[in-house]
């Protein structure tokens, strides 16, 4: 059991501040963040060049220490040493909150183990900022950060998450979004998704629609800039039906004058099946019937 009194405690140690930085718009930097960065003894920065530009903009002269995922293991003992000597440290990532898809978690754990106060200086967070403007249910939600890059691993990931009812938040590179949506469509079915691009910047854009609609849009206009995907959770109200029942519903629509492809598309959408998989299954059923 441990109780931390962030500001009223009597610890001789310095404090570890986790300071949020802008995710694209410098006007989102808070007064408290600027003041904290000016007052601490050290700034542990993911990229000292990027952070250097931020510090210059706000006239901050505090010394920096490089701290990122590739040197964290060797740097953490040094940083803990500074903190135990009574010096304060602000940890920043290139954008947003430290530890959220960025280095910092291991440093936080090490500080807590040494009973060093860890203090959040809140601010911009891309995932939550995109979620609240997405139009999808803001809670419950699950933030996953960056997806596996390899297609096979990504498909396994989506297969394990397809039945989750929570809204899901992902970061993705613009040149991988199309492949990611294809993999998602295969496992999730054609559910609602929001693609958020260049959040807080001049070219900020939201594309809202079904996964298949976004794929068509991306094919026509390739993406640029940093991207997030906000995906609708699995519906808990959709009646489960086996293939035979779905085939019957498709036939009813066809008999009512609907074209086969449109009938399959509507049934797949209603029951949250993957359209391509249902089409292939229906085609095989037709041939063998």
Q: Each predicted region: which residue ranges?
A:
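Glycine/small-residue-rich loop that forms an oxyanion/phosphate-binding "nest" at active or ligand-binding sites
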Residues: 79-125
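Glycine-rich, flexible N-terminal cofactor/catalytic loop recognition
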Residues: 1-67
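Class I SAM-dependent methyltransferase SAM-binding "motif I" and its flanking Rossmann-like core
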Residues: 107-161
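Short glycine-rich anion-binding loops that position phosphate/pyrophosphate groups of nucleotides
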Residues: 23-25, 94-98, 174-176, 234-236
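A contiguous loop/helix-start segment that scaffolds small-molecule binding in enzyme catalytic cores
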Residues: 2-5, 13, 167, 174-289
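Conserved helicase motor
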Residues: 67-73, 147-150
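Short active-site oxyanion
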Residues: 37-43, 115-119, 167-168
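Loop/turn-to-beta-strand initiation segments
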Residues: 15-16, 86-90, 166-167
